Amino acid sequence: MKTHRIAVIPGDGTGPEVIGEGLKVLKAAAKKFKFGLKTKVFPFGGQHYLKTGKLVDEADEAELRTFDAIYLGAIGLSGAGAKYVDPGILEKNILLKLRFDFDQYINLRPVKLYPGVASPITGVSPEVMDYVVVRENTGGVYTGMGGIMMKGTPNEIASQEWVYNRFQVDRCLRYAFELAKKRHTKKAPFRGLSAEAKAAGRTARLTLCGKTNVLTNVFGLWERAAKEMAEEYPTVELAYRHVDAICLLMVQDPGQFDVIVTDNMFGDIITDLGAACQGGLGVAAGGNLNPDKGGVSMYEPIGGTAPDWTGKNGINPIAAIGAAALMIGNLGETKAAEAIEAAIAKTTPKMKTQLAGQMGWTTTQVGDLVAKSL
């Protein structure tokens, strides 16, 4: 029996509550599908920083590297009565530090409408809204290159540089092409393909999101690299859309998307739009991945700490449970991941809404429902 070592960072606010439900479901899956789980809790977060002055250091990272994956709740201090921490301290020294030091170069965000979940898009069905966004996670404008000159004068200049190298682009595209290739088969191709594409042997679609008409250098590189790599994937139809068109179509015609690949900043924007379309942050899960051999990836619910709901047993744990499914699937337990997803799909129709305090169930009861559905 294989045992998976999971580093657990519950974090702040309602993070520990939703992570607790995710672990509950993981343990039920481990029992059913005969694999082991070994977990260790790490206290990183805003409260820990205020108490100890400690963030994440080299020794912490060395220990985290011995685990198979990291399961994260949420980190941050906000809400009434919260003690103040300067903006950027927690983000740069915990979240971004782990992302960059562990080279988690893929941000994976499934956009999936579960049964019974209300989408703001009228008439959309779970069969139509089921795609994945692959966001490059370590480059682009978020690397911090740039600066300010003549600060405080009428001629003050601020710049932020949008930089990519071919290596970063290629490895992100490679992951996206491989994911698209694996999502469908010839017998069950992507439903959005044309008859001509299916006749030509296409089974999947990868859509590159960029802005080649304005950001000609950066997205010229992305487009050129994608077209060259597409020659290696005859079953994957490569499409291109400008980012503004992507936003429009995610609302008007989500069924045309299978896998979307994009850069860091555009990915940051469209993934939150995707979360809204699928019913909100309460159901949106994601992963910061290093898919290379020996890489350690980090999985999390997308919502924040929700401090106003801390300790009230009313926060929605579905996103955290979905993140657990994503994690265990990427660790090789495919059947367990599929079973958890199926259990979520059986649970969401029983919930009144996906909003905190309005689910018709408590946080722990929702976790129980998913675990029992396994």
Pin down the residues of each PLM region.
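Buried hydrophobic packing segments
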Residues: 22, 26, 226, 320-328, ...
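N-terminal glycine-rich phosphate/adenylate-binding segment common to multiple enzyme folds
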Residues: 49-159, 265-267
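Glycine-rich phosphate/nucleotide-binding loop
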Residues: 48, 89, 248-351
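Buried hydrophobic positions in well-ordered alpha/beta secondary-structure cores of metabolic enzymes
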Residues: 12-15, 68, 134, 176, ...
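N-terminal beta-loop-helix "entrance" segment that forms/cooperates
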Residues: 34-58, 250
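Glycine-rich phosphate/diphosphate-binding loop of Rossmann-like nucleotide-binding domains
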Residues: 7-24, 28-30, 153-241
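Short acidic loop-to-helix transition motifs that present clustered carboxylates
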Residues: 116, 241-248
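Extreme N-terminal starter segment of soluble prokaryotic enzymes
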Residues: 2-6
